């Protein structure tokens, strides 16, 4: 249990998260503008996004499907009736003066996320669909603010947890698992580095053992799990200091400064009344058919926990290897691609998690960007399986292929790396090594068995690493016994 030790008591932290995940869609929620905030300023904007008079919203049903997939993946209830409402507030990058969202009737209610360490279930209150705002840019010119509406109207789903989270570590575990599920069900790429997932943390504290909830403050727009953990920890400690000094916590909205590691109040938190919610008159209620939801359910993929259990139970992977693979959706897909090509699960897992991951980490890139595709890894592993190259050589071939020096087959052919499997050729290497090392040979005959490993190494070295270790061992032992018998 996570506590903050104050001067007068031990304090518990109570956390609820609102996660804003960008829905995986080519187009915006209510217009056909592309979802691309990397384009030049205000170039991915339609008349509706810019709030020109008389232009009406048209719902992108692909976004509805993705939200349903998220809801199913999280075990929520899909509501066949939901309503889009206008949430009114003023901000320069919100051209309509309101955000189209869902409040009273969200598309998903309920659900949960199971985390580990500790093993715990975090309940989800609701998931609703809404549009993103634009972007205010303050650092282009002194005293001026510029508005880029490329992001305005990008589809989001807001996933609201219950206040079941009790520590910064649990908050990070929840977000990581939530991201993974969204990626598996193809509802969102959920890449925090690209701004595709942001968190608002509602934080309060209470004395250990109490059951009521304290006054909460909301920390907005946390764009990494590191800043999420730091912001929660700082805000919780701040609240403890205020309460222990006799003060009271004011309900307010805050931002987290990553440079000073402190939270900064921006405004008192608005109530639902101040937002003046009402049903958007330009959008009909969203009414879904049961068959539509059932068809989506039938197309749902295997979820992370199910896949991890299958890897352990059916493929006999270690729990560690299964977890490493499943914790990265693209690594899991890479692994499954190798299985479909006929490779043994444990071998495929080792080459991905040890050899390929080592190269990826060294270069600082993700597996989806790997120069060595599953097809190239298949080519490499077939060379190993057929004993055309040794595992030792294969590791070097993998490195060279990763660096763009060709396919595994091309590298093996170009550099004459095929393993020597001819007994007569290996016997020639063995005789040369034994003739060059009479002292070591004598020590072996006198009972020093460890000399065998030395002699095997010398034979492989003489073959430039191309001799099969298994055959070297076999031929060497036969020649040693022949010489022992010859010497009487």
From Swiss-Prot:
SUPFAM superfamilies found in the cross-reference section: GatB/YqeY motif, Glutamine synthetase/guanido kinase
Residue stretches in coiled coil: none
Please indicate which superkingdom the organism of origin belongs to.
Answer: Bacteria
What are its GO biological-process terms?
glutaminyl-tRNAGln biosynthesis via transamidation; translation
User: Per its UniProt entry, what is the enzyme's top EC class, as one word?
Assistant: ligase
Matching entries from InterPro entries are given as: Asn/Gln-tRNA_amidoTrfase_suB/E (IPR017959), Asn/Gln-tRNA_Trfase_suB/E_cat (IPR006075), Asn/Gln_amidotransferase (IPR018027), Asn/Gln_tRNA_amidoTrase-B-like (IPR003789), GatB (IPR004413), GatB_C_1 (IPR042114), GatB_Yqey_C_2 (IPR023168), Gln-tRNA_amidoTrfase_suB_CS (IPR017958)
* GO terms for cellular component: glutamyl-tRNA(Gln) amidotransferase complex
Name the chemical reaction catalysed here.
L-glutamyl-tRNA(Gln) + L-glutamine + ATP + H2O = L-glutaminyl-tRNA(Gln) + L-glutamate + ADP + phosphate + H(+); L-aspartyl-tRNA(Asn) + L-glutamine + ATP + H2O = L-asparaginyl-tRNA(Asn) + L-glutamate + ADP + phosphate + 2 H(+)
For this protein, the Enzyme Commission number is 6.3.5.-
Q: Where is the signal peptide?
A: none
UniProt-recorded Gene Ontology molecular function terms: asparaginyl-tRNA synthase (glutamine-hydrolyzing) activity; ATP binding; glutaminyl-tRNA synthase (glutamine-hydrolyzing) activity
Task: Please provide an example of a Pfam family that matches this protein in its UniProt record.
Answer: GatB_Yqey
Q: Which UniProt keywords are given for this protein, alphabetically ordered?
A: ATP-binding, Ligase, Nucleotide-binding, Protein biosynthesis
Q: What SMART domains would the database entry show?
A: GatB_Yqey
Record carries keyword ATP-binding: yes
Q: What does this protein do?
A: Allows the formation of correctly charged Asn-tRNA(Asn) or Gln-tRNA(Gln) through the transamidation of misacylated Asp-tRNA(Asn) or Glu-tRNA(Gln) in organisms which lack either or both of asparaginyl-tRNA or glutaminyl-tRNA synthetases. The reaction takes place in the presence of glutamine and ATP through an activated phospho-Asp-tRNA(Asn) or phospho-Glu-tRNA(Gln).
- Which family does this protein fall into? Belongs to the GatB/GatE family. GatB subfamily.
Q: How does it assemble?
A: Heterotrimer of A, B and C subunits.
> Which NCBIfam families does the record match to this protein?
gatB, PRK05477.1-2, PRK05477.1-4, PRK05477.1-5
Q: What is this protein called?
A: Aspartyl/glutamyl-tRNA(Asn/Gln) amidotransferase subunit B
The scientific name of the source species is Neorickettsia sennetsu (strain ATCC VR-367 / Miyayama) (Ehrlichia sennetsu)
**Phylogenetic lineage:** Bacteria, Pseudomonadati, Pseudomonadota, Alphaproteobacteria, Rickettsiales
Write the gene name. gatB
